[in-house]
């Protein structure tokens, strides 16, 4: 009910400004066009036409269907819902899928909290709200709906990692890996690095308890889960990765990363912790309003010493360093060019 009320307020703001989700950035030219193609293809399946075109120039986004359009949501299970919308409600379909992904991000955040042993319902609810309505969702998710896939699957992947650390089956993690890769390989690459950082921090907190042998076994289990997940979604993952590696934009966009950003960038980054700024600042949009900032301040000023607090501090410092140096943005972007489209990871930690 709370999310519905907040979503309604958001829609009323757009209506008051005579704005539309589809008119933002690449809405009509890219995301809406691909979403229409996905909807029409799915409807053809329902009417008995099971032929999936491998090449289609009509969308105007590139050459092959799977390799190019996976970035825009071909393979994303959420897009299956497009078949339920009539031809005269396509704008509503576009808005619904954005808000639905935001809602699912809150659910997956709550599930992660449950898996990690965070039982206080008030804390989980507040964290979910901060995560769902963080700057990345309100700016990135509105302009580019596919950006929400990174937010949606990160908590699931971290929950799967927790299950492995708790000596449970790797099946949940493997399925999450497959779904995340099939939904968007680009953000799954970033989530893989974020999960690697998470695993290292968690293992560092238990290195005396676990010992070298157990740590190596856990790393092998994680690797096995990732490989299994890739195999499950290989029919979509492999063509997508191949297309990305042979993309002319990647070949021409490689640039040398500077050692540091400008002073203006750091000023905006600090403000971005508690404000939703109108500019993306190189997609450094990690803000979780005053609630997330208050949580970080309490974490570093608290006299309570615990393993969990220590791990949170280490994780925050690591992500902050990556936000502060251009190399961090370049690494997270496949070493092509500098951008912090992974900044929802910081929003997750602050929430």
Task: Describe every region a protein language model picked out.
Residues 336-351:
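Hydrophobic/aromatic-rich transmembrane helices and adjacent perimembrane loops
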Residues 2-3, 102-116, 120-206, 218-241, ...:
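Membrane-embedded helix bundles of polyisoprenyl
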Residues 168, 203-212, 299-306:
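Cytoplasmic membrane-interface regions of multi-pass membrane proteins
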Residues 96-103, 126, 148-151, 187-191, ...:
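Alpha-helical transmembrane segments
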Residues 29, 37-42, 47, 70, ...:
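Periplasmic/ER-lumenal interhelical loops and adjacent helix-loop junctions
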Residues 7-109, 129-151, 244-249, 257-286:
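Membrane-interface coil-to-helix junctions
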Residues 15-17, 137, 207, 324-334:
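Juxtamembrane "helix-exit" motif on the non-cytosolic side of transmembrane helices
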Residues 60, 87-95, 120, 139, ...:
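Membrane-helix interfacial "entry" motifs
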């Amino acid at each position: 009910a709370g999310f519905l009320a907040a979503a309604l307020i958001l829609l009323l703001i757009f209506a008051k400004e005579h704005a539309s989700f589809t008119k933002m950035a690449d809405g009509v030219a890219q995301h809406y066009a691909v979403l229409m193609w996905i909807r029409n293809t799915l409807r053809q399946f329902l009417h008995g036409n099971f032929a999936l075109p491998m090449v289609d120039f009509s969308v105007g986004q590139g050459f092959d269907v799977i390799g190019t359009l996976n970035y825009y949501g071909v393979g994303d299970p959420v897009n299956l819902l497009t078949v339920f919308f009539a031809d005269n409600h396509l704008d509503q379909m576009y808005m619904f899928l954005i808000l639905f992904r935001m809602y699912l991000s809150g659910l997956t955040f709550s599930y992660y909290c449950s898996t990690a042993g965070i039982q206080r319902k008030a804390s989980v609810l507040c964290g979910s709200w901060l995560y769902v309505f963080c700057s990345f969702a309100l700016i990135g998710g509105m302009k580019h709906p596919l950006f929400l896939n990174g937010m949606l699957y990160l908590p699931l992947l971290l929950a799967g990692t927790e299950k492995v650390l708790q000596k449970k089956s790797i099946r949940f993690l493997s399925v999450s890996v497959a779904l995340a890769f099939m939904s968007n390989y680009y953000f799954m690459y970033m989530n893989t690095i974020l999960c690697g950082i998470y695993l290292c921090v968690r293992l560092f907190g238990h290195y005396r308890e676990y010992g070298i042998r157990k740590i190596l076994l856990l790393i092998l289990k994680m690797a096995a889960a990732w490989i299994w997940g890739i195999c499950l979604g290989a029919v979509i993952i492999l063509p997508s990765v191949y297309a990305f590696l042979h993309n002319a934009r990647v070949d021409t966009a490689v640039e040398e990363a500077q050692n540091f950003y400008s002073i203006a960038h750091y000023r905006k980054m600090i403000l971005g912790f508690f404000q939703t700024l109108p500019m993306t600042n190189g997609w450094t949009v990690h803000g979780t309003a005053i609630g997330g900032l208050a949580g970080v301040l309490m974490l570093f000023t608290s006299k309570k010493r615990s393993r969990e607090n220590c791990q949170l501090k280490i994780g925050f410092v690591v992500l902050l360093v990556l936000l502060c140096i251009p190399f961090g943005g370049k690494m997270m972007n496949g070493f092509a060019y500098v951008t912090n489209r992974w900044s929802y990871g910081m929003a997750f930690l602050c929430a």
